[in-house]
Amino acid sequence: MELSLSPKETEIRPNTIPDLKVDATFRKVAKHAITFAIWKIDEDRLEAVQRSHYGTFYDSCAYIIYAASLSGHYANHETITREQKPNVSLERYIHYWLGKNVSEQNRSNVVHKIQELDSYLGNISSIYRETQNLESARFLSYFKKGYDVRSGALISAPQRPRLFQLYARKWLRSIEVATIDWSHFNSDYVMVLQTDNLTYVWIGRSSSGIERRSALDWVQKHCSGSPITIVDDGYEQAMSQEHKELWNTMLPLKKRMVCQASQLVSEYADYNSNKFRIYKCNQRGRLHLDQLDVGMPAKDDLSDAHGVYLLDNYGQSIWLWVGGQAPQADALSAMGNGRAFVKKKKYPDNTLVVRVLEGHEPVEFKRLFANWLNVWQENTRGHKPVSTKFGKLDAHSLCERPKMAADTQLVDDGRGERVIYRVFGDQVQEVPISKTVVFTTNASFVVKYSVQCATVVPADLASVGIKTIIYQWNGSEASVESISRADKFAKASFDGLKEPGMFVQLYEFDEPPHFLQIFEGKLIIRRGQRTEMPYNGNSNALLDTFLLKVYGDASYNAKAVEETHLSSISSKDCYVIKTNHVWVWCGQSSTGDAREMAKAVGALMGENSLVLEGKESKEFWQSVAMYFNQTLVINGNGNSCSSSTSSSSGAGSMCNGSSNGGNISPTLSNNCYLNTSVPSKPRPPVQLFLVWWQQSSLRYEEILGFDQQDLSSDCTYILDTGSLTYVWLGSQAPNQERYTAIAQSYVQNAPFGRRSATALAVVRQFQEPNVFKGFFESWQNDYGKNFHSYEKMRKDLGNKVTSNCCFASEGSALILNNRQKDFDGHKKYPLTVLIQEMDMLPPDINPLKREVHLTHDDFVSVFNMSFYEFDELPKWKKMELKKQFKLF
């Protein structure tokens, strides 16, 4: 596919700028310093914004934000400027923000000014084009407590009355609207109406608890000294007569029309899309975009350092990557070409456009590429323990040092008690205790593990955080029935715990380090459709003949997996072959640690013999002829389909698994072993997302530069560590029972490389394990115990707040029954709309259920009773009343 863009379609044309002089205001910025600065462009004026006004914008202006931080760190509005040595690597970001009502002159001016700033800073900054209400996660991270957008049309108007929209979960946006009208109301929002003598806080019925809490905080900060009255969506008539009369002078209740939350869905459509297209930009008289024939983007697709590539996230965001050897003119014109692409594709005008430069790509860009390995080199956290042997010192260190536990993903040293259950079909069978643990690929296994902390110090015990882990392991050939039964059994075990615990759901191929550690790196995975455990009841020895490939070189990353056929053998591999004798074969390029792990697996089967490549006896070749052949062994790297078992990989690729049959699990294809444990490369930087359900779809906001204070008790979060996806459940979060659905939906829709078989972990607030806490700076175990819900905040406001009938006189919440909640969930219309002829009704109204679209106030006014009372009436009576009031 090819697109062609003419010069007239671009927003930025460098050749029209005769002389790129740098504004004197920009020259005050230290070039090699950690810093944060904001400038405002109002017509022809560029002025620096005072620090006290950071986070306040006018919708008629354009703004420029510059943020510089150490690599891997994040700047924000509180960052203090600090000079750095020339050899210190900095990340630089330039954002230009356009208000909803910004003039074309301001748009043009800001485009020129960012080129000046970029040039002054050495043309190495990433540039983001931001628009009001659709800002990037990085922009939002600069303002931890949210930001305010004031109306430029009201600059010269009286201070009161004013109307504000307050919404967004993590970063509260307060938007001042130019007119006071019902058209600005939405059931998703909290609305604030400020008058000279009173502040109304209108609570949209679809707003979340965290939005309501943030809104009350905002009101108390911005409306101090003014009496506050809280008005609930649909219950406006319950205001006192005095307050209602004042309200009606500005927002007549007879004209009430509030948009339903569902009308905002278009704003979020495909918000979590993980689909991408890559175009190569070519200048052939005019700009041509040649689409590359790729699926999931790979770093190798950006192969031309002299060129420019465009990454299209189907209208959600447009990224321009400029090669390190591309002409300067291409770097300058990249943003304009991105804007022209948006217009050509008829994407929304507020689509995010970002320009990045080779060697200076932000992490948000790098993670879009599943195989961008060198992106993680700057990550300060490795995932390989310092030692491959765990003595008392190491075990104790894991207990007292959460960061070490998080880096290694080891809760303890794996010496605690374990109980194993095998789930096959609908049968759950406890596995006899044995040093030899064998899993089969056609079944699921549930492991209940008791955490063992090598200390009695209370602080260290609190640091570990949990006492039990429930692991659910699903084989690659396990049926849907087996996985479903294991899922129910594991969840019931987790939900029934009497002590702090963690639930981990994982698949073959994705075993995390601690899971392998509890088996001391000697877990055996057998293939084939076995319905019984392959044990001899008397000797507890493995029966029949088989071939095991041993992956890994340490107890936390090793396991042995059965292979049924070999096409080649690498000299880096180790195998255990069970025939009439047990043989441990080690390639000449295998490491000493890998050989030790192979010998440990062989020892489980009894007397064994170590065989080194090149020193095989005739007896060996005769014994293993059905599996091994000298012609298969390829010296050195060879062409083995398995990856090297290098000192820290612990994973390879097994290309000869038995075929899946029947109804099998939706995991990664069983013919590829990838990333089974601790990788040779550092893990990706950890990501934190606030997640919630909206109309059966999972939505999420990324929180860059996170800390523990970003976790709210009434929310659910995803912590993505790369190898394990944690679901953190706040103590008062809704939908807690859907924790696995949350994680699975996230993995399937994340806009970067993830497999559906990624391991998932569930942790609850105040029961966080050390492997989770260690990803946060200065974790406080008691943080959040003084959390105040919206209902409690509303109650605690006491005499400061005058509430309508939703709350009793003493401020306690009126508990609505489920029928009343269902009633409040419907879109509301004025009575005049609902009594129209059927063909005149809005399309989302069921003519037989018109009454549910009345507000509570209108319902009581019409029927002289609440909906709950109405719903208790006999069917004939309800029908008679609806006919009487023309609602049928």
Swiss-Prot record:
Boundaries of every HP domain copy: 823-888
One GO term (biological process): actin polymerization or depolymerization
Record flagged with keyword tRNA processing: no
GO cellular component, one term: cytoplasm
Molecular function terms, GO-annotated: actin binding; actin filament binding; calcium ion binding; phosphatidylinositol-4,5-bisphosphate binding
Pfam families, per the entry: Gelsolin, VHP
PROSITE patterns cross-referenced by the UniProt entry: HP (PS51089)
Alphabetical list of InterPro entries matching this protein: ADF-H/Gelsolin-like_dom_sf, Gelsolin-like_dom, Gelsolin-like_dom_sf, Villin/Gelsolin, Villin_headpiece, Villin_headpiece_dom_sf
Swiss-Prot/TrEMBL Gelsolin-like repeat ranges: 307-366
CDD domains tied to this protein: gelsolin_like, gelsolin_S3_like
Annotated tissue distribution: Germline specific in adult flies.
Keyword terms: Actin capping, Actin-binding, Developmental protein, Differentiation, Oogenesis
Family, per entry: Belongs to the villin/gelsolin family.
Function: Required for the formation of cytoplasmic actin filament bundles in nurse cells, possibly by regulating both the polymerization and organization of actin filaments. Mutations in quail result in female sterility due to the disruption of cytoplasmic transport from the nurse cells into the oocyte late in oogenesis.
Protein name: Villin-like protein quail
Gene: qua
